[in-house]
Structures are given as C-alpha cells and as structure tokens.
C-alpha cells in the first residue's frame, strides 16, 4: 500500500511537491462540506465528519465538529498548508479551481467517492495512472458514515383524506419504473420519475458478479450472462478492449465512460474494492441522527455552518490559534444554536433507545 496513515500520506504529498512540482499536492477546497474536494473528506482520517452526530461513549450524541477528532484533523491540515502541500490560494479555492488544478497536473492525491474515476479523472486516464487506496486513518479512528441517506421528503397536508396514497404511488413508481423497468436494452434510464429508486447493493452486486465471471472467462471472450443488467453487459463488452489499453495505452482508443467505470467499479484494485477493504476491517461508524431537521437546526443551522467554515479556514491558514481559540470556538458554537440543537437531537435519540 502506498500510504496507511496520515503521516505516510504527508510523505507522499511531499514527493509530489519535490519530484513532480505539484503546487497543490492535495485536492482540497475551502468548502468544508457538501461537494467534491471538501474539507470534511480529509477530516475523516481522524474520525471527524462535521454536521454529523456521534455517540460519545456515554450514550449521548455530540456534534462531530466540536470533538477532539476535529481538533486533530485541523492540526494536520494546518501543517500541510504550512509545508506548502495545499494550494497557496487555498482560501479562495472552490471545487472548480481544485478541479482545474487536478487537470493541470498540479495535484497528486484526491479523496473522493468511488465514482471519482468517472469525474473528474476520466479525461486524465489516457495519459496518467491513478491508483485507489482506502482512506488512511489515524490509529483508532473510524470513518463516520450516514446511517440513513435521505435526500428528499414528501409531505402530505393534514387535511388529505387519503394520505396513504402517497406511499402507494411511490411503491408503484418503484414497481413499474424502478430497478428492473429502467434497464433498457441498449442502456439504462437514469430517472423516469421524480422518485428515484437507488439500490444500495447494486454497485457491490455488479463488482462481485463481474469478478466471479472473470474467474471463468478472464478476458471476457464470451457473451455476458443474459440475466445481467444492461450496464454490466456494457462493461463486459468493453473489457477486452480495456485489457488491450491497460497493456499498451496506445493500442486502442480510450473509451472514457466504460474504461473509467471498469477501473473504479470492477477492478480488484479499484475504488470500490478500496471501500470494501474499509468495511472488511470495520473501520467505520455511523452518524446516529437521521431524523427530520429539528426546529433549532432550521433556525440556526446556517449561522452554525458559517461559524464552522470561518473557523476551520482561519485555523488552516494559521490566522487563528487552534490551542488557545478552540474552547472559544466550541463555546460560540453552543451559543449560536448548538446547545439547543444538541438538546433536541438527544431527546430524539433517547426515544429510539
């Protein structure tokens, strides 16, 4: 493995700077959550994930951004900036600027989701070799994941005579236009209806199924099994050409969509395989709050978010003293709505024990 800890990662970043001339060795934007290249992805090395709620060991939920793990993460990121391993203009680096740095060869390491090979790396793969590794964790740290991934809510008026009709309609969408119905003969349908059905096991099923078939037919010389999805069949059909390209990048034309999919989703040294390693080692824990935003979160969430982002940025840029200012940061977080949010979320949590 290239790096197994934050310390080893730092050494790799130094190599990119010293031997490759990387001016932004790590792909880090000023945004701290909610997009590509955000600060929260890198804080995961220390078991921190802002705006999640974790059990403190006593049965109480605490905001991750106020924990010692966040303090450790900020200390590390500040050191990277001090040593020139982040972009010198980090304070103004939004995700689009970070993406530009990646495409200009100024960056060597990206933390991201398993589909990162498809964006933004797909255009770079013909001339650059990018490798996948699990997130390097501080000893004892665990990645914080959402227990429930909820993107949207549907609401029904109290005066509605038949509120159950909403669930019946959603079930109908999934039954007729969902997992199976959306698999067209020559491709697949991303979204036919406002309610999308995401099969959380689909990526792992595809990974396992294709790799089992490759044990029988390692060069994909035969047709894919008839019961496979259209997308899996598409990757299988492209696999022989992918092997030629892998052996010699000039042998065949790079097929951006399918080859990037194979590298990230199928290869046993790819991105999904790296995630499977993290799961197998039980190196994750959960965000324990998955309810509707509380009243205080709706009232104060914006100012709490701004408070965190400003402080994180100042710390990384060494404009704030982490040791002397940390307690004040937590105190201001509480006074800006955090105390009320914590009380409401712990009341919600207590009802579910």
Question: What residue spans do the PLM features occupy?
Answer:
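Second-shell loop/turn segments in exported
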Residues: 1-3, 60-64, 290-298, 312-319
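Helix-loop-helix "hinge/cap" segment bordering the ligand-binding cleft or interdomain interface
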Residues: 1-37, 55-106, 154-189, 320, ...
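Polar, glycine-rich mid-to-C-terminal structural blocks
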Residues: 75, 127-135, 144-221
